[in-house]
Every structure is written in C-alpha cells, then in structure tokens.
C-alpha cells in the first residue's frame, strides 16, 4: 500500500474509532449520568469496538512476531528496556489476564503461571502464546453480558467506567505496538501491513 494511501486509511480508521467513542459517550449521557451509569446498549457498542480493536492489534502483533528474525527476539535498544520477546510476551500476558479481567472476565493463567512468560524468547513459543492470549481475551470478552458493564469497576486502583477501562487497556497495548514498530524499523524489519 503506498504511503499516502496508508495515511488516508489510518486517518479514516482513527476517525471511525473516534466517532464510535463519541457516539457511545453521547449515548451514555442521560438522566442517569449523575450516577455514571451506561445503558446496556451503549456498553454493547463499546464492547464491540474494543473487540474489533483487539482483532486489529492481534493481526499486527502476530504479524510483527512472525516478521522478526528469531535471532532478534533478544534484541533491546539499551539495558533496562524490554527486548522484542519481552514486549511480545507482555502483550500475550495482557491477553491472558488484563484485557479480559479488566472487563470482568476470567484470567487464562494464574499469576504464578504468567510470571515465567517474560523469560520466553523462542520465536515459536512467543507466537503460540500471543495467539492463545488474544484468543483467550476474545473468548472471555465475547462472553461478558453488556448489562454487567454499565456501572463502574475497580481497575488499576480506581473506579472506572467502561470507556475509561477500554481506553486504558487498548491504549497500553497500542503503546507497546508502537514500541515494537520502532524496534522493527531499527532492525530493518518491515511491518507486514506496510509492504
């Protein structure tokens, strides 16, 4: 895809995402807004938008994981900064844990089972965990009744409404996607969607 076409597509996707969020926020503003309660319908829209975003991220993270040569999985830009495999395994862990539990779903692994994941550097194992982590998040989030998402939940030490939660989780994952894109470009790895 030519760069100009990619930019237009990216802007269009961002505009659609912002429109969905704006529409959701407008739908949630009602007489109940003083109580910070969303409607079930609004919660369903936010949940669907988050699932769609997770699917886009899944494709990009797995695409980058496949594009990186195995010998670059331990590469890091400097000491004290996550390596390629550590970023990928963090995202796998978020699929197993933070993404579904932030919305009330169940974790796919216990904390004890997740602890050693940051040490996995084998390309095939990393891709396997990414695939399983995203699949778990999707399955759990799809199973959540939107009616349970209308109020606030305690996430990251704060009471948060659903839009705040999905922005926090999605924002964190997108931040790491950007980090991984920078790692890829630094190592002359072209993101598959940019070819």
Regions found by a protein language model. Name each.
Residues 51-55, 59-62, 72-114, 154-195:
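Short, contiguous alpha-helical
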Residues 35-49, 94-158, 187-195:
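Short, helix-capping/interhelical loops that line the mouth of catalytic, cofactor-
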Residues 1-11:
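N-terminal secretory signal peptides that target proteins for export/translocation
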Residues 30-34:
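Sec/Tat signal peptide C-region and signal peptidase I cleavage site
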Residues 15-29:
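Bacterial N-terminal signal peptides
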């Amino acid at each position: 895809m030519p760069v100009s076409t990619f930019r237009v597509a990216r802007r269009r996707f961002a505009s659609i995402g912002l429109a969905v969020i704006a529409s959701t926020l407008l739908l949630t503003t009602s007489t109940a807004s003083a109580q910070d309660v969303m409607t079930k319908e609004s919660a369903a829209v936010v949940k669907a938008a988050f699932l769609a975003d997770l699917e886009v991220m899944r494709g990009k993270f797995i695409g980058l994981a496949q594009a990186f040569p195995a010998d670059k999985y331990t590469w890091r830009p400097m000491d004290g900064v996550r390596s390629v495999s550590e970023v990928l395994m963090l995202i796998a862990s978020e699929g197993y844990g933070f993404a579904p539990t932030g919305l009330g779903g169940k974790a796919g692994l216990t904390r004890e089972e997740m602890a050693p994941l940051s040490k996995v550097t084998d390309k095939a194992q990393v891709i396997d965990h990414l695939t399983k982590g995203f699949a778990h998040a999707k399955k759990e989030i799809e199973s959540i009744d939107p009616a349970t998402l209308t109020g606030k939940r305690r996430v990251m030490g704060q009471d948060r409404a659903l839009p705040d939660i999905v922005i926090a989780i999605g924002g964190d994952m997108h931040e790491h996607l950007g980090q991984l894109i920078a790692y890829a470009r630094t190592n002359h790895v072209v993101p598959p969607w940019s070819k």
